[in-house]
Amino acid sequence: MAPERVCLAYSGGLDTTDCGQEEDFEAVKSKALKLGAERMIIQDVQQELIDELVWPAIQCNAIYEDRSRAMVKVAKENNCTILSHGCTGKGNDQVRFELAWKACDPTLKVLAPWRMPEFYNRFAGRMDLLKFAEEQNIPVSSTPKAPWSMDDNIIHTSYEAGILEQTEKEPPKDMWKRTVDPMTAPDKPIPFTVHFAKGVPVKLEVEGKVVTGSLEIFKEANEIGRANGIGRIDIVESRFIGLKSRGCYDTPGLTILRQAHLDLEGLVMDSKVRAIRDRLSHDWSTAIYNGMYFTPEREFVEHAIKFSQRQVDGKVDLVAYKGCAYVVGRSSETSNLYSEDESSMDTLDMNWTPQDTTGFIAIQGIRIQKYGERKIKDSEPLTRA
């Protein structure tokens, strides 16, 4: 039998596709070739990542996979029959990779070393691998003094494992790579404006500069967030496989754009539609988090959410300052839901009178009054003695 060819998802780290991470790709390529790789292929999927994942995430207001699709393409072009990754057997990434591969090309086989007994019986964890790398003179970014795992792309940098597994301990200050410390961020507030069309950013204005184009806008938002310490989170999350895990995330640009989008929706979106969209957003976020990007349910939910964004046009003014992006104003020329005259406390310029609210309250109170009467009858009055 002829030997089979393997396409490996490789970043040069301990555990590569150009997803916008701050990476010395020439060094990664050199390292891969020295370790025995036949070829190192680096595909730039930044634009796809922004247009197909980040922009829908903003429309969905998601807090929670183009790399997998790119790997399938490379594997076919290079006659590979096996896809491989370095994900551990305890994480979500293994699920994300392999479910995407099944959708894109179910004929490809999978090689997952962290799930092979001959591998995990020899290397119980990252410290064993660090020791092996040192013995073999293999350079890695992790060290015994900084043993946490770090993954990076244009959207965020994530950190886990090592000292972070002790949930009560504060992350080391030198761990964060994507944002400055909010405590030492510049004392100068930075005003900027984000323009939206159909729920996605189309222009960003900051300090006299006008930025257009999805990738360029996201990079500029990343820079605003980086310089002002915006987008750091430290959470304990529930993985798809059933474990809880602590994760720290540097997500500057997406944090800023999501906040601006949420605020604009408050101005232009019907309240009932927004409530339904909020429920769907959770479904979309869960699908992405669990590796279900290439599924009919994700596609269905995303279409529904995009329909809700047809009138989400306008601009949001913000100020970046020491870890936060503060909204200071918003406007839209397409929505008629907000009326300054109708909302004013100083005028009666509206098509109803204050007396009309008496009937509104009476109708709304019918079931609530009956509930209160039932509680009194059951000797469970809602008033405190």
Question: Language-model segments: which ranges?
Answer:
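Nucleotide-activated chemistry modules centered on ATP-dependent adenylation/adenylyltransferase
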Residues: 1-9, 14-385
